[in-house]
């Protein structure tokens, strides 16, 4: 497969069209970060308000990934991806035309839905590549598409400067940035590509049927024990959404009257999810349907993959958010230099995620690969906890810190590739919903870790204005939390995760090898 990666024919054409769709959704989803300070200054926002807007950027991604997983299994990836791409122009234009804080929040909440597009391509790629090649294919999709976030960070300021001929906001330095034009442009490009994608791909290769579950209101499970496991694993979704509501209330966006309404909405979502699961599995619950052995799967597999995505992708989102300020504080660097050094963490994704999938394909044991990479990220974060002011000094110290960061990033993002090398192998007909659940847990991890990061200085006695010593200690403790979590989940992978049947087969269960030629 490696020799054919650059081909633009057949399944490789579909792979490249699909990773670029993911790339654009991440460009759109992350189009605020590089322009945040300009937006803040232009609209006169407070620090708390711009942070609230950033929180809203992930608020609906969790339920959206679950919902899109359901729609994906029902309507197919071609229609679902095209719809997400076309939809993205609406919140982008709303954000670009916003005149106050509330309008920004509404637009950002809608944009958080676009961040759920990732799960769609997991199903699309699995339809075009056989089990023996799925690791590398999903790794390329995830790694190259995920670079959209870094591309956004590297290019949008320049784009906003280029568009300044039509107006913009003048910075204290005298530079003019048309942030509204840059944000709008990302949505327009995504809209156009959504139409192109719709007419350029098919859900499956010619002659291959698209496997759909009989019901898509909730994930289909095959035993009563798995039913209760699924219900239990949905509780953290409601819990983390409640935490987001609490954060929005703390910064004043949700008032004493709207905060309870938001919590009721979260409860309603949980009830909706639970009822959908019951409806989908009602025949299993009342005993009128018993799955034959060859059609069963263990939900435990899904639960462990959800945990792996917490510690790899969840930690990635959290670390990417704090790493520039971490380097700036630890080594007393200018913001620009700190940002460049921190970007090395994201750049590793281009190679590491495909590498994780390739390792999973080549080792002959996807379970052990998952365990090894997860343990590796655990030890990597523990090594990063040693990076403190005074511990690494001078240019050599900075280089060592960057090396440790990139080493840790390799295990983190290879682990992401390994996770989604396993997802399509659990149960093919519900791959979309499984990908949605696993992907949503990545966001659960990110929100959890970011809340821990923001609260650690307070827990360590720093108050509202912590000392440099407290900040350094809290940064170290944060990496230790990430590391210990990785080691625990790595242990689960080694001792509780099972190798899926047909992990390296020429075709999925019920399909023919010639479908993938």
Per-region residue spans from a language model:
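C-terminal membrane-cytosol helix-exit motif in multi-pass small-molecule transporters
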Residues: 187-210, 234-249, 266-285, 489-498
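Helix-breaking motifs and short loop linkers at transmembrane-helix boundaries and internal kinks
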Residues: 44, 76, 97-102, 114, ...
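A membrane-interface helix-boundary motif in multi-pass transporters
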Residues: 161-187, 247-261, 454-486
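Glycine-rich segments within core transmembrane alpha-helices of 12-TM secondary carriers
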Residues: 135-164, 438-450
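Extracytoplasmic gate region of multi-pass secondary transporters
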Residues: 32-36, 230-263, 300-343
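C-terminal transmembrane helical hairpin of 12-TM major facilitator-type secondary transporters
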Residues: 366-418
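Central cavity-lining transmembrane alpha-helices of secondary-active solute carriers
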Residues: 52-70, 343-356
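Primarily marks hydrophobic transmembrane alpha-helices of the MFS/SLC 12-helix fold
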Residues: 81, 104, 369-370
């Amino acid at each position: 497969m490696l020799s054919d990666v650059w081909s633009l024919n057949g399944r490789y054409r579909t792979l490249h069209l699909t990773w670029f769709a993911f790339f654009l959704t991440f460009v759109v989803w992350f189009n605020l970060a590089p322009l945040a300070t300009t937006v803040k200054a232009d609209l006169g926002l407070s620090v708390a308000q711009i942070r609230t807007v950033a929180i809203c950027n992930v608020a609906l991604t969790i339920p959206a990934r679950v919902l899109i997983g359901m729609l994906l299994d029902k309507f197919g990836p071609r229609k679902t991806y095209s719809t997400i791409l076309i939809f993205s122009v609406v919140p982008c234009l709303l954000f670009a035309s916003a005149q106050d804080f509330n309008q920004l929040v509404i637009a950002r909440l809608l944009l958080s839905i676009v961040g759920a597009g990732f799960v769609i391509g997991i199903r699309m790629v699995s339809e075009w590549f056989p089990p023996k090649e799925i690791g590398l294919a999903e790794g390329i999709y995830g790694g190259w598409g995920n670079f959209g976030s870094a591309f956004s960070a590297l290019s949008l300021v320049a784009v906003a400067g280029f568009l300044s001929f039509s107006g913009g906001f003048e910075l204290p330095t005298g530079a003019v940035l048309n942030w509204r034009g840059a944000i709008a442009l990302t949505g327009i490009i995504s809209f156009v590509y959504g139409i192109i994608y719709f007419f350029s791909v098919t859900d499956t290769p010619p002659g291959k049927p698209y496997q759909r579950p009989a019901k898509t209101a909730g994930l289909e499970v095959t035993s009563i024990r798995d039913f209760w496991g699924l219900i239990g694993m949905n509780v953290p979704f409601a819990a983390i959404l409640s935490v987001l509501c609490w954060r929005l209330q703390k910064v004043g966006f949700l008032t004493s009257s709207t905060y309870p309404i938001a919590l009721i909405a979260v409860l309603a979502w949980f009830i909706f999810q639970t009822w959908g699961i019951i409806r989908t599995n009602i025949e299993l619950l009342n005993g009128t349907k018993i799955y034959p052995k060859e059609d069963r799967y263990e939900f435990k597999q899904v639960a462990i993959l959800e945990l792996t995505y917490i510690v790899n992708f969840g930690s990635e989102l959290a670390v990417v958010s704090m790493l520039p300020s971490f380097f700036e504080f630890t080594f007393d660097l200018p913001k620009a230099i700190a940002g460049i050094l921190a970007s090395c963490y994201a750049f590793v994704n281009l190679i590491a995620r495909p590498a994780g999938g390739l390792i999973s394909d080549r080792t002959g044991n996807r379970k052990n690969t998952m365990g090894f990479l997860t343990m590796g990220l655990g030890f990597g974060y523990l090594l990063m906890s040693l990076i403190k002011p005074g511990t690494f000094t001078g240019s050599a110290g900075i280089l060592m810190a960057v090396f440790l960061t990139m080493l840790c990033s390799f295990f983190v993002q290879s682990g992401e590739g390994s996770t989604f090398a396993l997802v399509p192998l659990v149960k093919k007909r519900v791959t979309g919903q499984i990908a949605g659940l696993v992907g949503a847990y990545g966001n659960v991890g990110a929100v959890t870790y970011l809340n821990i990061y923001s609260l650690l200085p307070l827990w360590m006695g720093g108050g509202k204005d912590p000392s440099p010593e407290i900040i350094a200690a809290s940064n170290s403790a944060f990496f230790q939390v990430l590391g210990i979590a990785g080691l625990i989940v790595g242990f689960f992978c080694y001792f509780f995760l099972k190798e899926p049947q047909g992990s390296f087969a020429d075709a999925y269960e019920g399909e023919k090898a010639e479908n993938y030629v």
